Amino acid sequence: MIHILDIHSHKPGEGAIYNLTIEELRVPPPYFNQKQWLSVGLHPWSLTEEWRKDFLHVRKWALLSQVKAIGESGLDKIIKSPYQHEAFFAHVKLSEEVGKPLVIHCVKAVDEIIKIHKLFGPKQPWIFHGFRGKPQQAEQLLKEGFYLSFGEHFNLDSVQICPADKLCLETDESCFSIKEIENRIRKVRKSESESFSKDLLFQ
């Protein structure tokens, strides 16, 4: 079992879970640096009528030991795509099948994501990536068992109320290092020693 600090990054690096691009997914595994931890999934923005073919690649990658999470996948109300729900459900089922956490992309769809979580009752952790919501929304998600992942931009109050064992960190597309983001979070929480997401261990 390993503990990972940077749970979602679009830049490869030691100690980070690098999220493969759609182009990288289409190359048969394992071609990537096998020491690099990965996450695999179809971003809502990447979905086309051919998404099921791409998802076959996701399934192949998901079986590799270096793949530590499924996603990012979810719902995004800013874009109009008829494939989002079906694709998201497929990722939920894959997460459960391979026993790996699901990284959630959510834009203006929190209530719907919660309903889906209740519908499936997953055993695997769902990590709400890039969380910037207000504390009321954070409390709503925490109550349902979600993990919250904070990056460069975050709500100060939400960071303060999030239990350490439900708090994750990520660089996403930030120019800041994970250490810089960690230091900012610790400053807000006035804590130098607590262990974040200590009960979220990756296979």
Predicted region positions:
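Mid-domain alpha/beta scaffold segments of enzyme catalytic cores
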Residues: 1-203
